[in-house]
Curated annotation (Swiss-Prot):
This is Pyrroloquinoline-quinone synthase. It comes from Bradyrhizobium diazoefficiens (strain JCM 10833 / BCRC 13528 / IAM 13628 / NBRC 14792 / USDA 110). InterPro entries: Haem_Oase-like_multi-hlx, PqqC, PqqC-like, Thiaminase-2/PQQC. Transmembrane segments: none annotated. The keyword DNA repair does not apply. Ring cyclization and eight-electron oxidation of 3a-(2-amino-2-carboxyethyl)-4,5-dioxo-4,5,6,7,8,9-hexahydroquinoline-7,9-dicarboxylic-acid to PQQ.
């Protein structure tokens, strides 16, 4: 199998004509999906990392992204609830701690709030999620629903966007520090921490799907789960682009005071 054989992938699935007959072919297909559909390719991210947004637009991104970040441990709790296997639950549990933290230790959600606070947003307003775009809420809730309703294999597979996360974190850290005078290293701590957390999580999930997707149909479902997740990430940026770059902010959503 080569990249040319994967050109028939749609916005929903890899299609019925693609047969993945081994774990190696599965991994190759997953990496192709990431290389062609990960949200690092979205025009909004190009603007964000290239210093082309104003402060209000960066605030809007951080505010909306908070809803996704703060929902991740809820999603992971749902994933854990799908498994009778104790070893899998133990492995997955640290993901909740990574984001929620623990008594006396900071987690990813607190680090994200450092970012929004550093950008000048009121923390109570951010945590209320009252100002996020409707599309943000719909996409994130759809992700939780997916992990609850689909198979445990698909629930794990939907996390495989983490295979491609380190590169976007590196690009974001470098680009935002270089281009925005209102960004400093302290408020970028979330991304620095994920440089080590994401590869660990991705490696487990990749090995899990390689081992447990044993038929072409199961391998297709794994690929389709990753396609779904790339759509979840992509559509959130579509909404930000439409609202804050093209100027179509929906009623009641956050309106930046700075530009």
């Amino acid at each position: 199998m080569n990249a040319a054989s994967l050109t028939g992938i749609t916005a929903l699935s890899i299609g019925k004509d693609i047969k993945l007959n081994s774990a190696e072919e599965l991994e190759a297909a997953l990496r192709h999906i990431g290389a062609t559909r990960y949200h690092s390719l979205h025009p909004f991210h190009k603007l964000l990392h290239g210093g082309k947004l104003n402060k209000g637009q960066v605030q809007a991104w951080a505010l909306n992204r908070y809803y996704y970040q703060s929902t991740i441990p809820i999603k992971d709790a749902v994933v854990i609830s799908r498994f009778r296997d104790r070893a899998t639950r133990l492995e997955w549990r640290h993901r909740i701690e990574d984001h929620d933290g623990d008594v006396g230790s900071e987690g990813g959600i607190e680090r994200w709030l450092k970012l929004t606070e550093g950008l000048g947003l009121d923390t109570a307003y951010v945590e209320s999620t009252e100002g996020i775009l409707p599309a943000t809420r719909f996409a994130v809730e759809a992700y939780v629903h997916y992990c609850r309703e689909k198979s445990p294999l698909e629930a794990i597979a939907s996390s495989l966007t983490e295979l491609f996360a380190p590169s976007i974190h590196e690009e974001r850290i470098a680009g935002m520090l270089q281009h925005y005078d209102f960004v400093n290293p302290d408020i970028m701590s979330y991304f620095k921490r994920r440089l080590t957390q994401a590869p660990r999580d991705a490696n487990f999930a990749l090995e899990y799907v390689r081992t447990h997707a044993r038929t072409p149909e199961e391998r297709a479902s794994v690929c389709n789960a990753l396609i779904f997740k790339t759509n979840v990430l992509w559509v959130q940026l579509d909404a930000l682009q439409h609202a804050y770059v093209e100027g179509h902010i929906p009623p009641g959503a956050f309106v930046p005071k700075e530009n």
